[in-house]
């Protein structure tokens, strides 16, 4: 994540406008964390907040796994860091879509020790956050046209569905994951799917039907 923060700092530094800057260190959750903090700022005193992040495959391999030159084998449970970037502007004024609720997640550690199976490690926290959101809002999964997680990947997605079902919530029909959607499993060998700060951002166009009123 350090290379992403350094790149963001250099981008902001070289602008003529000297705008305030927060460097958010959140790994796969960076964009959503930025949106949560940005929406709180807009609700309070900010007029416009730009939320942006990025990730890069080779940088992530070097930083968190092994340099590509080593030629290490990747287990089937591993995921492929997305080389991608994107941004969203939150504003006090506009026609939407709106951020109406935010539910920050808690640390949920189920004791997963395999560093190559991040989907299994992250799925319990996603499930806890989702159910907390349902309880806080009084809503059920059927209220939403789409429930989309950031980068649990193929393995994490199935675990999340099973965990929700074990607690009485059926999310199978309207739930998907950006790590599953970003790559074509049949033609691209990315094992358990995509991951990284740029994973969900690269699929931000999913929100376009919301703006057009196609989904609510």
Annotate each language-model stretch with its function.
Residues 9-19, 41-43, 64-73, 164-169:
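A glycine- and small-aliphatic-rich helix-loop capping segment at beta-alpha/alpha-beta transitions
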Residues 28-29, 53-59, 105:
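Acidic, glycine-rich active-site loops and adjacent beta-strand->loop/helix elements
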Residues 147-203:
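Internal helical hairpin/lid segments
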Residues 67-131, 136-139, 172-184, 211, ...:
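Condensing-enzyme catalytic core mediating Claisen C-C bond formation in acyl metabolism
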Residues 1-7, 11, 204-215:
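Single conserved hydrophobic/aromatic residue that forms the stacking wall/gate
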Residues 7-26, 143-158:
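Conserved beta-ketoacyl condensing-enzyme motif
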Residues 19-26, 72-77, 111-117, 187-196:
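A short glycine/serine-rich beta->alpha loop
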Residues 24-52, 90, 194-207:
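Active-site-proximal alpha-helical scaffold in enzymes
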């Amino acid at each position: 994540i350090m290379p992403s923060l350094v790149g963001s700092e250099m981008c902001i530094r070289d602008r003529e406008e000297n705008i305030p800057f927060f460097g958010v260190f959140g790994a796969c959750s960076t964009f959503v964390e930025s949106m949560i903090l940005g929406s709180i700022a807009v609700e309070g005193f900010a007029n416009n907040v730009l939320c942006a992040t990025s990730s890069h495959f080779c940088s992530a391999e070097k930083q968190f796994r092994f340099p590509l030159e080593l030629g290490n084998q990747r287990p089937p449970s591993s995921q492929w860091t997305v080389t991608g970037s994107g941004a969203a502007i939150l504003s006090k004024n506009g026609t939407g879509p709106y951020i109406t609720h935010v539910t920050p997640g808690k640390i949920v550690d189920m004791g997963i020790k395999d560093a190559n199976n991040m989907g299994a490690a992250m799925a319990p926290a996603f499930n806890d956050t989702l159910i907390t959101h349902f309880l806080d809002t009084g809503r059920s999964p059927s209220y939403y046209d789409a429930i989309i997680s950031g980068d649990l990947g193929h393995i994490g997605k199935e675990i999340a569905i099973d965990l929700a079902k074990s607690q009485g919530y059926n999310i199978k029909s309207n739930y998907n994951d950006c790590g599953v959607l970003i790559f074509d499993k049949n033609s691209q060998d990315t094992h358990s799917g995509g991951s990284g700060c740029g994973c969900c951002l690269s699929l931000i166009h999913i929100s376009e039907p919301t703006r057009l009123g196609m989904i609510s």
